[in-house]
């Protein structure tokens, strides 16, 4: 209880019997099917019954272009959101007409855990035999490089900001302010580290707590550099020489082996087609690109507050976590 399990390596959860095994989010379906003793399953909820997608034409070979733009988040609605990206990758994985994938990255980084989950999901595409080519935009740094590093081929613009292979943690400390205003903090906990995060903010960290936090950061950096080394086919030590948060222009990243070629997204698509041995192919965007003019017209589709409220409620109800809570409907 006094080892502050929230900051320990994940394997200790198994060692102490808190969990049975460790799996990636992307692999949960496989685990559930194994325990359920079925090869496939399908759930039906009220919202999914009214949200029927049209069958796609799978006669033409496709190249999927997956756009990963913005900050990387564990959850939310804007930027590169873990569950949204994993869902898009799963859709690509299931489409047998997709023969190659271009990952368009325009991100300064973000959540280390979400980056690891997306990295693993990209690997599952490669395990299926799909070539993955990365096209970097203005920046693909930190987590942006993390999700890119396992690609079969990486393009960057000459002025792309990339690299930033590093990880850090910050904990605010307002202990002096608390003392100045005469505020005291107390509570009852089950072990000495149960309120570590709260105490760190209001009271500061003692040497043991600081060591726990530092250990967590160092494990994250070790994993990050290992992923990069594996993806680029070099030693971890070589990655660490150009790591520690250093940021590189695309043209310099080419010289040190972080990318394979300078070029734009069109060249990345052409390279993906080459690696997949494709002649003619269709390009499919994920998420689907919308026409800005059509989006503007949609704003005028409803005129009353009631109608706009209904639209927002439908949008809210269609979220996966909300759908999971809706009652199951049995069709007889």
List where the protein language model places each region.
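C-terminal long alpha-helix characteristic of the crotonase
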Residues: 19-62, 225-231, 260-301
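C-terminal recognition in membrane/secretory proteostasis and scaffolding
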Residues: 104, 180, 274, 282-287, ...
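Intrinsic disorder and flexible/low-complexity segments
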Residues: 60-63, 67-97, 216, 287-332
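Short glycine/threonine-rich loop-to-helix capping motif typified by GTGT followed
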Residues: 112-117, 252-255, 297-299
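Active-site proximal loops enriched in glycine and acidic residues that flank catalytic Cys/His/Asp
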Residues: 67-70, 105-107, 136-138, 158-160, ...
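Charged, glycine-interspersed solvent-exposed loop segments at helix/strand-loop junctions
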Residues: 1-31, 175, 179-256, 260-262, ...
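Cleft-lining beta-strand/loop regions that shape enzyme active-site pockets
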Residues: 55-180
